[in-house]
Amino acid sequence: MPALACLRRLCRHVSPQAVLFLLFIFCLFSVFISAYYLYGWKRGLEPSADAPEPDCGDPPPVAPSRLLPLKPVQAATPSRTDPLVLVFVESLYSQLGQEVVAILESSRFKYRTEIAPGKGDMPTLTDKGRGRFALIIYENILKYVNLDAWNRELLDKYCVAYGVGIIGFFKANENSLLSAQLKGFPLFLHSNLGLKDCSINPKSPLLYVTRPSEVEKGVLPGEDWTVFQSNHSTYEPVLLAKTRSSESIPHLGADAGLHAALHATVVQDLGLHDGIQRVLFGNNLNFWLHKLVFVDAVAFLTGKRLSLPLDRYILVDIDDIFVGKEGTRMKVEDVKALFDTQNELRAHIPNFTFNLGYSGKFFHTGTNAEDAGDDLLLSYVKEFWWFPHMWSHMQPHLFHNQSVLAEQMALNKKFAVEHGIPTDMGYAVAPHHSGVYPVHVQLYEAWKQVWSIRVTSTEEYPHLKPARYRRGFIHNGIMVLPRQTCGLFTHTIFYNEYPGGSSELDKIINGGELFLTVLLNPISIFMTHLSNYGNDRLGLYTFKHLVRFLHSWTNLRLQTLPPVQLAQKYFQIFSEEKDPLWQDPCEDKRHKDIWSKEKTCDRFPKLLIIGPQKTGTTALYLFLGMHPDLSSNYPSSETFEEIQFFNGHNYHKGIDWYMEFFPIPSNTTSDFYFEKSANYFDSEVAPRRAAALLPKAKVLTILINPADRAYSWYQHQRAHDDPVALKYTFHEVITAGSDASSKLRALQNRCLVPGWYATHIERWLSAYHANQILVLDGKLLRTEPAKVMDMVQKFLGVTNTIDYHKTLAFDPKKGFWCQLLEGGKTKCLGKSKGRKYPEMDLDSRAFLKDYYRDHNIELSKLLYKMGQTLPTWLREDLQNTR
């Protein structure tokens, strides 16, 4: 109690005036604190008239500081997040947002774009305790800074808990404050600056691909740059630059020497302030070094989950050797330069070798000086790699006879043997990439017959542009690799006459499109031409400068491999690309130009009946075939009326094989082909494949009660003597546990899984628009087929409609409707259709009713969303569920 007594004595000696004075001081302090936080919370950028001057000399600014408490940074936990990037954009068409997406797509990183919410809902960030995103990118960092309190806290807590970083861009405009503090951060921004001479901070921890040994001399693009300044140890500069002149930045001070200081244009937040790591850019991605650092930022903030290895494989093809007009070909000095440059490039790319593609027919068809160049080139035959073009440089798709095509190849091979050119490289390129994609079957067969070709390349798969979408595939035992352009074409032979000026070529090389191609692709096959190596030798100029630039600015390890080994490496990296995706050749003009004129897209079906099995698809197939304007496919010797192209191994036989199942169209416009394959419905690959080849097709599916469908499939298997179906009862099949045999589980899946109607229709809706899909009531098709066929005709939009009431008749013996022929006779389906089965046992029906309850509810929601009528069986089932 002595302390209490002392306090009482002290209070007796303190005057009331002193107490009031202390209370006044306390209130002032409280008001000051409250105003600071309230005022700071409501602004994205705070004016900073007396911001501390940046000390931006060498070493770079951002001196360590411990003024603010440090928070531990949560380490990235790859197993807890999906490798998906969430990109917040200003709009779906904003330039910076598209550039960010383009880099992610080029790197084959998965992403999701969202319009940046101001006060809207934040996308769901977690799913069952797992983070949905490994990285957050804001096109406009102020959209993040100014998030409403709820969403900001939600996002920040997610980033801390799951170790997720943020990349943000600040793009100044005419309304931007010249000097401001970023709300809630110990970071100052100085905007609308012109900068020059950019350098890289060698101490930056995020550097991976970027090599910090160079300075990019000269003016940086634009005058709207923002630089960052802070005294907090959480901020580390990544890129630094000088201002163009001290006069242009009065808000940074009037020191005459200030313009020579370095200012951070990209800054890394190490997470010491609030536990979240960030990388902030003071401009967009127009500056090439920003693209390079952006790639490193993505890698660093995701713990290299979203990054490519440093190895880059490069192959330079020189097409049209011996081909070319006089004046465009290589002479003796050009050939020597080619050989010397190859040796020079080997200093940076071990065993680098130019790959020469020849057409022997044109040997010695230039001037005397050019013919001497041909001779010298052949004397160096062992110094280069070689691959065949066509003998006469003809486009293979123009040859419809495989034997004639093979004869042309044999002439080129004879020329090669006579001149000591190796013929076992296993690689070939078709002139203009003709016949590679779209596939010309005769080319692939002739290549294998004459040359034993294993690898080719094309720039046309799946399309020429955008180049970042080019992919590889394997067809008929031949690996097809994506081929890249490098800014050089047959007509670009003089440096000073380069389109747009020589500076355009240098821009492509030094940080431009060619540089980015190597940066973002593990394997690059470049297409050049003979004419690029004569005259000004732009081919040599381009690749010497490219390799030099890559060596100066990156840590990439440049390598090369012969074509076959390169293809094997490619499909080791991108194994998911082995399966091709056949597209409609008539949807791309370039594809149509290199597709045989004997083929027509009118031969493709306009309607697919996709199933599922045991719902009445064969009956619908028969009814459609009765229409005079509708023609079905020819039957298959293996799968009868079904082609089964899009869901299985037949797909790899190609579109020529597929088209053979349909008649050559007549001159009438009413031709309407269709095909029915009931196992397309629940196939995971069929929707995407079908939509690629038949993007405008209509799709029909028939649904019956999934319990009845499952039982019908079981009985179908028993009728075909399936030993598993004969051994087990239906109830045993559908209730089998996870410990059941693989064969029993397989039968169970074929009974149950196709009945997940909503799941499968959703997959088709991801490939086709809802107005291209019609869901038919299988029960109604069985009882009132004419009514259903009226709906189908309207859906298809056929010119001539027929009255199915007059063409269908019920056959009491069969128990279903059949085609009515002259004289009152009927044509019905075969004996395998309309079988009589025992009634399903009550326990099985009860089990399936419960099993499919949620699936049927989802189906009803989906059909409502599609604007389609609920089948009668579904309405009854839902009513009983209630």
Curated annotation (Swiss-Prot):
Residues 40-598 are annotated as: Heparan sulfate N-deacetylase 1. GO terms for molecular function: deacetylase activity; heparan sulfate N-deacetylase activity; heparan sulfate N-sulfotransferase activity; N-acetylglucosamine deacetylase activity. Its EC number is 3.5.1.-, 2.8.2.8. Keywords: Disease variant, Disulfide bond, Glycoprotein, Golgi apparatus, Hydrolase, Inflammatory response, Intellectual disability, Membrane, Multifunctional enzyme, Signal-anchor, Transferase, Transmembrane, Transmembrane helix. Residues 1-17 are cytoplasmic. Residues 1-169 are annotated as: Sufficient for localization to Golgi membrane. Gene3D superfamilies: P-loop containing nucleotide triphosphate hydrolases. Residues 599-882 are annotated as: Heparan sulfate N-sulfotransferase 1. One of its GO terms (cellular component) is Golgi apparatus. Glycans are attached at residues 231, 351, 401, 667. GO terms for biological process: aorta development; cardiac septum development; cell population proliferation; coronary vasculature development; embryonic neurocranium morphogenesis; embryonic viscerocranium morphogenesis; fibroblast growth factor receptor signaling pathway; forebrain development. The keyword Transmembrane applies. InterPro entries: Heparan_SO4_deacetylase_dom, HSNSD_N, NST/OST, P-loop_NTPase, Sulfotransferase_dom. Pfam families: HSNSD-CE (PF12062), HSNSD_N (PF25119), Sulfotransfer_1 (PF00685). The active site is at residue 614. Residues 40-882 are lumenal. Disulfide bonds join 818-828. PANTHER family: BIFUNCTIONAL HEPARAN SULFATE N-DEACETYLASE_N-SULFOTRANSFERASE 1, HEPARAN SULFATE SULFOTRANSFERASE. Monomer. Belongs to the sulfotransferase 1 family. NDST subfamily. It is linked to Intellectual developmental disorder, autosomal recessive 46: A disorder characterized by significantly below average general intellectual functioning associated with impairments in adaptive behavior and manifested during the developmental period. MRT46 manifestations include delayed psychomotor development apparent from infancy or early childhood, delayed or absent expressive speech, hypotonia, and therapy-responsive seizures in some patients. Behavioral abnormalities are variable and include aggression, self-injurious behavior, and sleep disturbances. This is Bifunctional heparan sulfate N-deacetylase/N-sulfotransferase 1. It comes from Homo sapiens.
